[in-house]
């Protein structure tokens, strides 16, 4: 699924922050996984990487519903 342009719940424009968050998420996962790209990490249900503080660190003013859309959406074009 692609990241929505606006939040389905509150209407906040998520699309304007999607590229910033995606770049920061890639760098954050690289540092947590010792330089491995997110595309090369094997699927493992026990692997947990907390991303909730990343939005706060970037200074993006979002509600919980918007955070959920950004964190849980995976752009399949990068993996297939």
Swiss-Prot record:
- InterPro entries in the cross-refs: RNA_pol_su_RPB10, RNA_pol_suN_Zn-BS, RPABC5/Rpb10
Q: Which GO terms describe its cellular component?
A: DNA-directed RNA polymerase complex; host cell cytoplasm
GO BP terms in the entry: DNA-templated transcription; viral transcription
Top-level taxon in the UniProt lineage: Viruses
Which key words tag this protein in UniProt? DNA-directed RNA polymerase, Host cytoplasm, Metal-binding, Transcription, Viral transcription, Zinc
- One Pfam entry for this protein is RNA_pol_N
Which compartments does it reside in?
Host cytoplasm
Residues annotated to bind Zn(2+):
7, 10, 65-66
Per its record, what are the GO molecular function terms?
DNA binding; DNA-directed RNA polymerase activity; zinc ion binding
PROSITE patterns linked to this entry: RNA_POL_N_8KD
Could you tell me what this protein does? Component of the DNA-directed RNA polymerase (RNAP) that catalyzes the transcription in the cytoplasm of viral DNA into RNA using the four ribonucleoside triphosphates as substrates.
Q: Which family does it belong to?
A: Belongs to the archaeal RpoN/eukaryotic RPB10 RNA polymerase subunit family.
Tell me, how does this one assemble? Part of the viral DNA-directed RNA polymerase that consists of 8 polII-like subunits (RPB1, RPB2, RPB3, RPB5, RPB6, RPB7, RPB9, RPB10), a capping enzyme and a termination factor.
What protein does this entry describe?
DNA-directed RNA polymerase RPB10 homolog
What are the top taxonomic ranks of the organism?
Viruses, Varidnaviria, Bamfordvirae, Nucleocytoviricota, Pokkesviricetes
